[in-house]
Amino acid sequence: MSHRISHVNAQYILHYDSPHQFEPLLPSEPALAPLLEAAGDLTRKATALGAASGKAAQSELRKLLRSMNSYYTNRIEGEHTRPSDIERALQQDFSTNADLARKQRLAVAHIRTEELCEGELNRRLAEDGDSTTRWLYSPEALTWLHRELFRDLPTDDLRLVDGSMVVPGEIRQRGVAVGRHEAPTWESLPRFLARWQQVYAGTRRGEASVVALAAAHHRLAWMHPFLDGNGRVARLHTHLLLQGWGLTSGLWSPLRGFARNEAKYKALLQAADEHRRGDLDGRGNLTEAGLVEWIEYTLDVCTDQVEFMTRQLHVGGMRDRIQAALAYETAVVKSGVREEALMPLHYLFATQGELGRADFKTLTGLGDRVATSTLSALLNRGFLATDSSYGSVRFAIPRHALRFYFPALWPEAEQDQALLDGEVGLGGPTRSALRRKPLS
């Protein structure tokens, strides 16, 4: 192993093998006050968003956001594919192009893991309460996340460029360097992980724990405990902790914000890797200023995502967006959906409840035969969801309507859908043909 040599407090560090070398794990008191204030602002806004939205909206958006989170976390790694390719992969429709199929499998792996881990987290929260979020800081939890992310991938997908293999859930057994940063020796990782858990799991609940979450994200990436997949694990870990504290309600995730300014995300992570920048930069081995800048950025990203979704879910604005989606369906897609469905659809969104089919048809103001065909078209196009062939209906969010319902939430999916619609509208291949033909 090649060792990076750096000058710290008149001592030369040949390699990282002791937990004191990645101090500070939290900012000192003078730097902490504004961070706690920002964390409090985030918590208040996130709590208000969750309280204002109904369970139905949370359920529908959660499914959509899993695909979006998968797209963005893989984009940060340079392993993303088109949103439509993700949708196909969820239907077990994989490309004949080997590299695209590999990226599709990575996307599905994240979606499956996020759903599974959220379910397990909710189960543990019901049984153990606050101890569950503390458990997420354990080596056991980290290896669980890594194992779930990679366990279903074929052998070829787990092979790195140097020929070595990633073992799902296994702490690395060799030294690694990531860019300019040489991670701790593999023999010392248990000690680093124990210290990481001790500090962050021991932080008091509230604003301090949110600040600790941001710091923990960097220090986890810095340790690089796995041979590969550390960024994916760190981002999923952050997502799950925010959910465990009841701050996301399935309505937002920091993963979108991290990827929206990917260069800044990576630059600040790297800057926080640096050694202390002088006598005024804290008392630890690593830069406190860099850690503070990273925490500020993470809190800003989360707050921005909360504010964005708060605007998107405003009931008044949604009426106009539903109307635009229905107008497009009527004039362009000609799917049988009619604009008279606006009133019952907006009612379902605003109340986050359900309507019997007869009541829904009555609210359209259409005759029974036309109302019935309209209802069927809405179900076929995914504007409505139901649990049975004759059951009540509820508001749903089809991906093709995303650009109308939640503009700019997932711009790449909007562009992808517009391209697909353009191909179909210009007399190109049918949608079923597009599903069979891999898209480059």
Residue ranges: model-predicted function:
Residues 1-440:
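FIC/Doc superfamily catalytic core
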